Amino acid sequence: MRAKPQSPLPRNPVPAWSPPTTTTDPMLEKDAAGGDFPANLVLQLMPLKTFPAAIRGVIQSELNYSVILQWVVTMDPEPVLSWTFSGVPCGMGEKLFIRRLSCEQLGTYMCIATNSKKQLVSEPVTISLPKPIMQPTEAEPMEPDPTLSLSGGSAIGLLAAGILGAGALIAGMCFIIIQSLRTDRQRIGICS
């Protein structure tokens, strides 16, 4: 006597943040008639084709945008493909179109291919909203560097030294110009 067919979904679903590659979960190792496959059989989870593209098993999409999930699987005889959303059947066929994505449609999707000989399960894909862009934080006020700050007496001293330096520069330039003019007059006087 054969065991009753059980749910094709795993007892312990694989977390979406860690895309699976293989499993040995006996719940996934049932044929369509409900018979057991050998317990040491390694079941390969097949990836889905998605739009937008899934990264590490996660599709990030804005609300009201379309999401397309597709699973191309080759089995003999031809399988029946059924889609699940968080463990609940939600569609049939090779493609699942989610038009105008809403908050209620965010979650984990899987596809199950069943024929008279066996059953295959796709890798789970989680649809989520994009992570918000972090706003820049307010800059903390910087403390002035005490070695470069001027205040009080040192500021007045620097200002006075600057004024005296500028005065000396101007006086030196005037002296050079006057000397140059005197020298030119003396040359003219000698030549005449």
Curated annotation (Swiss-Prot):
The keyword Cell inner membrane is assigned to this record: no
Superkingdom field: Eukaryota
Topological category with respect to the lipid bilayer: Single-pass membrane protein
Every Ig-like domain range: 20-128
Biased composition, class Pro residues, residue ranges: 7-18
GO biological process: osteoclast differentiation
Region listing for Disordered, in residue ranges: 1-26
Stored InterPro entries: Ig-like_dom (IPR007110), Ig-like_dom_sf (IPR036179), Ig-like_fold (IPR013783)
PROSITE patterns on file: IG_LIKE
Cellular component aspect of the GO annotation: plasma membrane
Tissue occurrence: Expressed in bone and small intestine. Highly expressed in osteoclasts, and low expressed in osteoblasts and peripheral blood mononuclear cells (PBMCs).
Chief site of localization: membrane
Localisation: Cell membrane
Glycosylation sites: 64
Transmembrane segments: 158-178
Signal peptide location: none
Function: May be involved in osteoclast differentiation.
Protein name: Immunoglobulin superfamily member 23
Organism, scientific name: Homo sapiens (Human)
